[in-house]
Amino acid sequence: MNIDDLIYVVKNQLDKDFCEHCIEKFKKDDNRYQGGIGRGLDLTTKQSIDLFISDKEDWKEEDTIFFESLSKNFGFYQEWVPDPYERFVHDFPSEDTGYQIQETEPGGFYHWHHDQLGTRHLTFIWYLNDIHHDGYTEFNSGLKIQPEAGKMVIFPGLWPWVHRGVAPKSETKYICTGWIREKIDKDE
C-alpha cells in the first residue's frame, strides 16, 4: 500500500450550476480576505483570496449543500478505506470545520504543506471550476489531480500527505475546502 491508496477522488459530487452559483456569489461578497495559513498570513506560502462561509447567514443554503455532499462522501470514504487504516476513520467521533471558498488567480499558489493542525485528520476539497492548464493539486507521491467542476477529493491531512496547489497558468481557480476533525466534547 502507498499513500495514494488513501486519496479518494470522485467526480460530479456537486452540480455544475451550483458550482457556478457559488463562484459568482463569492465574487460579489465583501467579506473576502487575503488567504492565510495556520500561523497567519504568509504570501510566500499561499496566495489566494478566501471566504469562510459557514458562519454567514446569507450562505446557509450553500453550506447545507456542501454539508450533504460531505456527509455522503465521508460515509463512502469510511467504507472505502482499507485495513489497517479503517479504524482511524471509524473509531473517533468526527465533525467538519466548516467550508471555505478559495480563489487562486493565475500565478497564485499554495506551496507544499500538510494540513495537520490540532485535531484535524482528513482534508476535503471540491473543485468549483475546470482548469485546463496546471492549477492541479499535487501530492508528494507525484499524484496530480486536475480541477473539474464538482469533483471532490478526501485525504488524510497528516504530514505524509504533503501537497500543494500548483499555480493556474491562465485561469482563475475556485475550490471549497475544509477539514474533518476529531469531535471536541464541549463538556470537558
Predicted regions and their residues:
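Catalytic core of non-heme Fe(II) oxygenases with the double-stranded beta-helix
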Residues: 67, 72-188
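Non-heme Fe(II)/2-oxoglutarate
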Residues: 1-92
